[in-house]
Amino acid sequence: MARKFFVGGNFKMNGTRKDLKAIVDNLNNAQLDPNAEVVIAPPALYLDFVKQNLQKPNVEVAAQNVFNKPNGAFTGEISATQLLDLGVKWVILGHSERRNELGESDEFIASKTKYALDNGISVIWCCGESKDTRQAGETIKFVENQLAALAKEINDWKNVVIAYEPIWAIGTGLVATKEQAQEVHAAIRSWLKQNVSDKVAEETRILYGGSVNAKNCKDLAKEQDIDGFLVGGASLKPEFVDIINANL
């Protein structure tokens, strides 16, 4: 089965209404690959604003976080019910910035992923290694441990998109070579085959993230197990359109 090309744009803590309107207008006016699925993740307080201004049927909106409880005394958190109330059906979970800056563990991320999926929200689940882990030759083992923590919590993977983002490449200008990225993507798919099922391994989309731009996206997209991208800084720029159209 051919896996549909997927591009996510993680705006992180960037943009005002004026900035985001310009980004959305650029997407609305662009000729986008009709065979690409696109999801953009603005800051939480602009989710509805972005959603109201989007006019492309194949572009959806994602949250950058969701909590693992339905409601209650959890200051600053967002529930799945609240996201669904806005019509938001995607969320990014496990990003290294939340793992490292906010101390989110593999287990906590897995519990949030399960909660989102159980409530009908699809998940872009992030994994990836540090520079030290890469240099120690332990990248694949590290990523497999992250996958194992997730697999303990979830059984149904059909609404999970995996994003491999080597931490040393996020926002640094460094980028994994297409061979480095393909090696890890293939290892992730192999792990899914061995530990989940052939069907999940074949159907799950695995994205690459980490300093993706208009110059390197086409070569990366040609690799067998790279099914798209999770884009950070470049998603705020006009070149995001070129990344979406990497297969054209």
UniProtKB/Swiss-Prot annotation:
Keywords: Gluconeogenesis, Glycolysis, Isomerase. Coiled coil: none annotated. Its EC number is 5.3.1.1. The active site is at 95 (electrophile), 165 (proton acceptor). One of its GO terms (cellular component) is cytosol. Substrate binds at residues 10, 12. The keyword Transcription regulation does not apply. CDD domains: TIM (cd00311). GO terms for biological process: gluconeogenesis; glyceraldehyde-3-phosphate biosynthetic process; glycerol catabolic process; glycolytic process. GO terms for molecular function: triose-phosphate isomerase activity. It catalyses: D-glyceraldehyde 3-phosphate = dihydroxyacetone phosphate. Pathway: Carbohydrate biosynthesis; gluconeogenesis; Carbohydrate degradation; glycolysis; D-glyceraldehyde 3-phosphate from glycerone phosphate: step 1/1. Pfam families: TIM. Belongs to the triosephosphate isomerase family. This is Triosephosphate isomerase. It comes from Neurospora crassa (strain ATCC 24698 / 74-OR23-1A / CBS 708.71 / DSM 1257 / FGSC 987).
